[in-house]
A protein has these predicted regions:
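Active-site/catalytic core of tyrosine-dependent DNA strand-transfer enzymes
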Residues: 184-224, 235
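Catalytic-site neighborhood detector that most strongly recognizes the C-terminal catalytic loop/helix
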Residues: 170-175, 255-286
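Conserved tyrosine-mediated DNA breakage-rejoining catalytic core shared by Y-recombinases
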Residues: 102, 145, 154-190
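C-terminal catalytic core of tyrosine-transesterase DNA break-rejoin enzymes
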Residues: 70, 140, 144, 151, ...
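Phosphate-coordinating loops and pocket residues in cytosolic domains that bind phosphorylated ligands
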Residues: 55, 126, 154, 162, ...
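Basic, Lys/Arg- and aromatic-enriched nucleic-acid-binding interface segment
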Residues: 69, 73-77, 88, 92-149, ...
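Short, polar N-cap/turn motifs at the start of nucleic acid-interacting alpha helices
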Residues: 159-163, 245-268
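N-terminal core-binding DNA-recognition domain of tyrosine site-specific recombinases/integrases
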Residues: 4-12, 16-92, 110, 131, ...
Length: 286
C-alpha cells in the first residue's frame, strides 16, 4: 500500500513476519495459541498502517477487550511484538515501541513496590522546583489526583477548576467517568501552570512527545523507570496508608475504581463530598 509516496505496512503484514521470526518459533505451542486468540481480537486494526497507530486508540482497543487482566495483557503483548518487528524493519519510528509499553492494563493487583517511594517523590518535587518541566508537573498531578495517563489526555480543560480545587472528568468505568477529582492544595499552582499550554486534554504535546519527555525526566531524576501508571498507584497506595484511615468509599471515589462491594457502600452513604476528598488528599505527604 502506497501512502504519500512511501510504502506503508499493515498490522497483518507485520504480524506474518512476527510468526516467521525465530523468537516466535521458540514460544511454546500453548502460549502461541493464547497469542493467536489475542490476535483475533484485534481484527479492527488488521488493515491499518502500523506507523499510523496512536496511543489513545490502542489504549481504547485494549480496554475494550472482554475479560480482565490476562486477555488484555496478551493483546498488548502482540501489539508490542508487531511494533517491535516494524521498528526492526524500519517501517515505523522506534518511539512507537515505547508507546505500546505504556499502554495501561487493568485489574492485576499492584504491590507496594509499584508505588513511588518518598525519596522518589521528593526527587520529582525537586525537579519541578528546579525546572518547572511540564512532564514533571503531570507526574505530580497524577500522584495527588490518582488520574490515569489517558485521563490527562482526555480531560476537558473547561472542567478543570483550580480555584475550586476540582477536576470533573475521568474515563473507563462508570465509577471513573465524570467524577469529582480533588486538587490538593500543594498542586494547585502546578495545575495553574500547565493549563495555559494544554492542547491534548491537559497535556501540551502528543503521546509520542509525552513518553519521550517522561523518559528524560526519569533519567534526570534518577528514579526507577516505571511507567506513568505508577503515579496513580502511588496515590492509591499512600491514601490507604494514612492514619487515621481514609475509608475505601472515599478512596475509590477519588481514584474512580469500580468495585461492586464498594459501590453498594457508596450508595448507602450517598454522594461523597468534594470536601471529604480534599481532606484526604491534603493529608498526603508525597
Amino acid at each position: 500500500m502506497e501512502n504519500g509516496g512511501s510504502k506503508s505496512h499493515t498490522v497483518d503484514e507485520i504480524f506474518q513476519m512476527v510468526q516467521q521470526s525465530k523468537k516466535w518459533l521458540e514460544i511454546t505451542p500453548d502460549k502461541r495459541s493464547h497469542y493467536m486468540t489475542a490476535y483475533k481480537r484485534m481484527e479492527c486494526i488488521y488493515d491499518r498502517d502500523v506507523a499510523s497507530l496512536r496511543y489513545s486508540e490502542l489504549q481504547n482497543l485494549v480496554d475494550g477487550i472482554e475479560g480482565a487482566f490476562y486477555p488484555k495483557r496478551d493483546v498488548k503483548t502482540i501489539l508490542q511484538k508487531i511494533v517491535d518487528m516494524a521498528v526492526l524493519e524500519e517501517v515505523c519510528s522506534s518511539s512507537k515501541s515505547e508507546v505500546i509499553r505504556c499502554i495501561e492494563l487493568p485489574s492485576k493487583p499492584l504491590t507496594g513496590k509499584d508505588a513511588r517511594t518518598p525519596e522518589e517523590m521528593q526527587a520529582i518535587w525537586d525537579d519541578w522546583n528546579k525546572t518547572h518541566d511540564l512532564i514533571t508537573g503531570y507526574a505530580l498531578i497524577m500522584a495527588y489526583t490518582g488520574m490515569r495517563t489517558g485521563e490527562l489526555f482526555a480531560q476537558d480543560v473547561t472542567q478543570v477548576n483550580p480555584a475550586g480545587q476540582v477536576i470533573v472528568g475521568g474515563i473507563k468505568t462508570e465509577a471513573g467517568k465524570n467524577r469529582e477529582i480533588p486538587i490538593a492544595d500543594c498542586i494547585v499552582p502546578i495545575v495553574q501552570a500547565v493549563l495555559p499550554q494544554a492542547r491534548y486534554g491537559m497535556v501540551a504535546y502528543d503521546e509520542n512527545a509525552y513518553y519521550s519527555n517522561w523518559a528524560q525526566m526519569i533519567q534526570r531524576t534518577g528514579i526507577r523507570p516505571l511507567g506513568s501508571y505508577c503515579q496513580r498507584h502511588t496515590c492509591y497506595t499512600r491514601l490507604h496508608e494514612l492514619v487515621p484511615a481514609v475509608s475505601d468509599v472515599v478512596i475509590n471515589s477519588i481514584i474512580g475504581h469500580s468495585n461492586s462491594k464498594i459501590s453498594k457502600l457508596a450508595n448507602s452513604y450517598g454522594h461523597i463530598s468534594l470536601s471529604a476528598k480534599l481532606e484526604a488528599v491534603n493529608r498526603l505527604t508525597l
